[in-house]
Structures are given as structure tokens and as C-alpha cells.
Amino acid sequence: MNLASISQSYMSHNENERSIVPYIPPPYHPTAPALAVSASQMETMSLGILNQAMSSSAGASGALKDEKAAFGAVAEALRDPEPIRKIKRQVGIQTLKTLKVELSGMRRKKLILKIIMFICANVTMATSLVGGMSIVDEDIAKHLAFDGKGDWVSKTVHGLNLLCTTMLLAANKISEKVREEIARTKRDIAKRQSYVSAATMSWDGDSVTLLRDVKCGD
């Protein structure tokens, strides 16, 4: 047997071995086709929600104003492209934590102001009552007279009355500003929370699925 016949026999043997190996196709996992949402559908949905946000808010309560702000945030989330939406979502999550901490501090400040106003109001009422009784009752007027031993008592009563009245007015003015800041912060929280929840959802064309998990406020 020559070398050529041996080589040919070896090659045919290898081909037979390779042909015996069965072909195993990769596993197939059937999946439902994804429904693509067109940009026109998103814009139509955004305009519909924006109409709710643009309605008149005259005479509306704080909750209704927060709702309109949430509608505007959802419309903005639907209008933004996907990369911008993801960036805003990440930034909004971090901002929400800071806003909630600030809101807790404002509420504590409001509680302290209420306590100060309560104390000042009671002291003002008491000193005003003593001053009014001194006008009616001559004995009290003698004790609170400016010319005599009751001079320091009268000055103390009138000084406390003036001081507590001033503190009451100042605390009331500061409390109004704090209430406005709380309302504005709650509205900002509602807007960002609505944007984050809207940016997290995936929409398949069904408005019920889209709006089911939207959160508004805390």
C-alpha cells in the first residue's frame, strides 16, 4: 500500500467520524413580539395630560394645585426623549431625598413657631387683662401706680405686654412664610415624584397601564 492510498483512507475515515456527530441547534425560547410605541402616540398622550395641567386653578385647593403640577410632570416625562428621561429620573431621585429632608425641617420650624405664638398669646392676654382691670378697679390701679411701690410691677406688666405682642406678630409673619415654603416644597415633591414614576413605567399603548402606577406627592 502506497502513501497516497493511506492518506486518502485516513481522510475518508475522519470525514465519516465528523458526519456521525449530530447537529444540536441552540434552544429556542418563544417570546411575544414587543409593541413599539410611536412618537406620535407619546405626543398625543402628552398633550392630553397637559390639557389637564393647563386648566384653570382659580379657587383650587393645595391638593388640586399639586395634582395639576403632577399632570404637568407626567406630560413632560412623555414628551422627553429616552436618554433625557433617564437622566432626569436619576437627578429627580436624589433631589427628592433632599426635598423631603427640607420638608421635615420646615414642619419642625412651624411647630416651634406655633408653640411660641401660643405662649406669647397667653402672656399678652394675661397682661392686657391686668391692665384692663387696673382701669376699672382702683385698688389694682394703686398697686400698679407709677408713683409708689408698684412702679416696677406696672412697668413689668406693660413691658411684657409690648414684648409678647411684638413677638406674636413677628412669629405669625414668619409662620406664614414657612407655610408658603411648605406648600411650594410639597408641590415640588409631587412634580418630581410624578416624573420619576412616569419615567420608570413602560407603556404598551394602554392608558390604564400607563397611569396605574403614577405617584403624586408623598
Swiss-Prot record:
**A Pfam family in this protein?**
Orbi_NS3
Q: Where are the transmembrane segments?
A: none
Family, as annotated: Belongs to the orbivirus NS3 family.
Q: What the protein does? A: May play a role in the release of virions from infected cells.
Q: What is the protein named?
A: Non-structural protein NS3
- Species of origin reads African horse sickness virus 8
